[in-house]
């Protein structure tokens, strides 16, 4: 009876494969079809979800050496050798983005001249008309200066009418004459002091 049971078990085993065999385990796994794989768009580099583990054996993308904006997981912009050579030749990093050209033209709605530019005519200082006094006018002015170095307006007007000059010219002449008189006074005072300073060391010896 034991032999009959063993024979029946062997017949059942020959008809049905063992559930722990390699063929049975591999056949029970669901296979992903190629259209299903193609329907899933590949995620761009650098934005992979942290939950999805990376496939073992997949080479990690090398960082781009030709710009400073690429992340560590970004795809390389070119061959590693060419990118490394370009980065070694340039002393500064390349920046992405369009360069803004400098505007050298004239501003819109205005002339081509700069706002702070001033024409040559406006830089010229207005020169005063220098009055040439006659001998008679100089004598009258000097005579009044000896009497009064600071004449008032009425005195200047009377003198200007007598010597045929404007009162403004007479006032300017008195200002210049007082400045000249002060300069002569300081020069004469310093001339008197200098000989005494030079003679003092000789007297002490």
Curated annotation (Swiss-Prot):
Residues 126-185 bind DNA. Keywords: DNA-binding, Homeobox, Nucleus. The keyword DNA repair does not apply. Residues 33-58, 185-205 are annotated as: Disordered. GO terms for biological process: anatomical structure morphogenesis; regulation of transcription by RNA polymerase II. One of its GO terms (molecular function) is sequence-specific double-stranded DNA binding. It is found in: Nucleus. CDD domains: homeodomain. SMART domains: HOX. The keyword Cell cycle does not apply. One of its GO terms (cellular component) is nucleus. Detected in adult testis and pituitary, and in 9-10 week fetal tissue (thorax). Probably expressed in other tissues at low levels. It holds the Pfam family Homeodomain. PANTHER family: HOMEOBOX PROTEIN GOOSECOID-2 (PTHR46643:SF1), HOMEOBOX PROTEIN GOOSECOID-RELATED (PTHR46643). May have a role in development. May regulate its own transcription. May bind the bicoid consensus sequence TAATCC. Belongs to the paired homeobox family. Bicoid subfamily. This is Homeobox protein goosecoid-2. It comes from Homo sapiens (Human). The gene is GSC2.
């Amino acid at each position: 009876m034991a032999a009959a049971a063993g024979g029946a078990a062997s017949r059942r085993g020959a008809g049905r494969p063992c559930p722990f065999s390699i063929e049975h385990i591999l056949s029970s796994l669901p296979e992903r079809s190629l259209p299903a794989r193609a329907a899933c768009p590949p995620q761009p580099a650098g934005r992979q979800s942290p939950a999805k583990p990376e496939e073992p054996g997949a080479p990690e993308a090398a960082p781009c050496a030709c710009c400073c904006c690429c992340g560590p997981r970004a795809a390389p912009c070119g061959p590693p050798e060419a990118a490394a050579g370009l980065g070694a030749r340039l002393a500064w990093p390349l920046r992405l983005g369009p360069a803004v050209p400098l505007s050298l033209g004239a501003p819109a709605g205005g002339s081509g001249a700069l706002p702070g530019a001033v024409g040559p005519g406006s830089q010229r200082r207005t020169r005063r008309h220098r009055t040439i006094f006659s001998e008679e006018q100089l004598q009258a002015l000097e005579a009044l200066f000896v009497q009064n170095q600071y004449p008032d307006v009425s005195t200047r007007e009377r003198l200007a009418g007598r010597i045929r000059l404007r009162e403004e010219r007479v006032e300017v002449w008195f200002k210049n004459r007082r400045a000249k008189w002060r300069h002569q006074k300081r020069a004469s005072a310093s001339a008197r002091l200098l000989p005494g300073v030079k003679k003092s060391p000789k007297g002490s010896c």
